[in-house]
């Protein structure tokens, strides 16, 4: 019998808690990540008021310098620690895959200066359409269609862009490039980005409609991902007949592997919390695991180096946390963590190599406090231990510490 009948894991995308031991091996605009500290710098520069996460023990997590505006709790209601990454990467897929028990020794490729000419030329030759070279760089998905949508409507050229993650995205106006044609082009792009030097996690079709200054992305998005190279704890749960719920982009990150209930994409963090609560309160979800990604911290504020917006986004989540806790059953476990850092005060615009926070809460807890500093994959091992399934590649369970 499971110690916790249901487990809920929320990833606050990019909410790191201080530079990892190997952070200087990773750079941002030529600056090593060794001084990065997402939560620390937000707390120091613009203030951070997250009383509900503080109650769980966020301010108790060991650091060289305590979080300036998040006090330690003398009697927290949950367990807390920080976790270190072992994989060779600081992107979303690497972080999530390791959290589910894999060690990624060959990092995905990211293209901060845009994709090489060879890839663009191959796509042009396959599609018979030119690629707008000026869009070929990391770009906001809404900004790129605002900037190049009018040109695409005139010329039929492809808008190809990327982000901080290992993705190639193709935006196409549905009246100019039909959705099925866009899908075929994306399938070709997927076929040429399966190995180094262009090993990409996802190819994303981004259809949109409308007129200049009023473009809207449609629900016809399609993600062409690659599956994890080995079974994750999601697969182990699924094979054992245990329900697994995806909220947000989790299903995309794992290419649907090991997911048997997909709550769909989130329009925002708040929408994601709504979807999580909908899953938690469903009569069908009696036993199993839910996995939620809330990406606004990263996508809207981290890459754009906006500490005020990042802070406000954290405040917004913290205000919703009591609703999530209210949806829990007595024998549920809630876990809150991250997948990498993205210090909005740091050099460059890329992710930062950081520890991630880990908070755990259950209404059934008799004790609380700190658990030993561990690794990302310890989360997956704890999930496997709880449900009595085989763990994935790496990770050590701390289930016995949660009492």
Curated annotation (Swiss-Prot):
<keyword id="KW-0479">Metal-binding</keyword>
<dbReference type="InterPro" id="IPR017850">
    <property type="entry name" value="Alkaline_phosphatase_core_sf"/>
</dbReference>
<feature type="binding site">
    <location>
        <position position="351"/>
    </location>
    <ligand>
        <name>Mn(2+) 2</name>
    </ligand>
</feature>
<comment type="function">
    <text>Isomerase that catalyzes the conversion of deoxy-ribose 1-phosphate (dRib-1-P) and ribose 1-phosphate (Rib-1-P) to deoxy-ribose 5-phosphate (dRib-5-P) and ribose 5-phosphate (Rib-5-P), respectively.</text>
</comment>
<keyword id="KW-0963">Cytoplasm</keyword>
<comment type="similarity">
    <text>Belongs to the phosphopentomutase family.</text>
</comment>
<dbReference type="InterPro" id="IPR010045">
    <property type="entry name" value="DeoB"/>
</dbReference>
<dbReference type="GO" id="GO:0000287">
    <property type="term" value="F:magnesium ion binding"/>
</dbReference>
<protein>
    <recommendedName>
        <fullName>Phosphopentomutase</fullName>
        <ecNumber>5.4.2.7</ecNumber>
    </recommendedName>
</protein>
<feature type="binding site">
    <location>
        <position position="13"/>
    </location>
    <ligand>
        <name>Mn(2+) 1</name>
    </ligand>
</feature>
<dbReference type="GO" id="GO:0008973">
    <property type="term" value="F:phosphopentomutase activity"/>
</dbReference>
<dbReference type="GO" id="GO:0043094">
    <property type="term" value="P:metabolic compound salvage"/>
</dbReference>
<keyword id="KW-0464">Manganese</keyword>
<dbReference type="GO" id="GO:0005829">
    <property type="term" value="C:cytosol"/>
</dbReference>
<comment type="pathway">
    <text>Carbohydrate degradation; 2-deoxy-D-ribose 1-phosphate degradation; D-glyceraldehyde 3-phosphate and acetaldehyde from 2-deoxy-alpha-D-ribose 1-phosphate: step 1/2.</text>
</comment>
<dbReference type="GO" id="GO:0006015">
    <property type="term" value="P:5-phosphoribose 1-diphosphate biosynthetic process"/>
</dbReference>
<dbReference type="InterPro" id="IPR024052">
    <property type="entry name" value="Phosphopentomutase_DeoB_cap_sf"/>
</dbReference>
<keyword id="KW-0413">Isomerase</keyword>
<dbReference type="GO" id="GO:0009117">
    <property type="term" value="P:nucleotide metabolic process"/>
</dbReference>
<dbReference type="GO" id="GO:0030145">
    <property type="term" value="F:manganese ion binding"/>
</dbReference>
<dbReference type="Pfam" id="PF01676">
    <property type="entry name" value="Metalloenzyme"/>
</dbReference>
<dbReference type="GO" id="GO:0006018">
    <property type="term" value="P:2-deoxyribose 1-phosphate catabolic process"/>
</dbReference>
<feature type="binding site">
    <location>
        <position position="339"/>
    </location>
    <ligand>
        <name>Mn(2+) 1</name>
    </ligand>
</feature>
<feature type="binding site">
    <location>
        <position position="340"/>
    </location>
    <ligand>
        <name>Mn(2+) 1</name>
    </ligand>
</feature>
<dbReference type="InterPro" id="IPR006124">
    <property type="entry name" value="Metalloenzyme"/>
</dbReference>
<feature type="binding site">
    <location>
        <position position="303"/>
    </location>
    <ligand>
        <name>Mn(2+) 2</name>
    </ligand>
</feature>
<feature type="binding site">
    <location>
        <position position="298"/>
    </location>
    <ligand>
        <name>Mn(2+) 2</name>
    </ligand>
</feature>
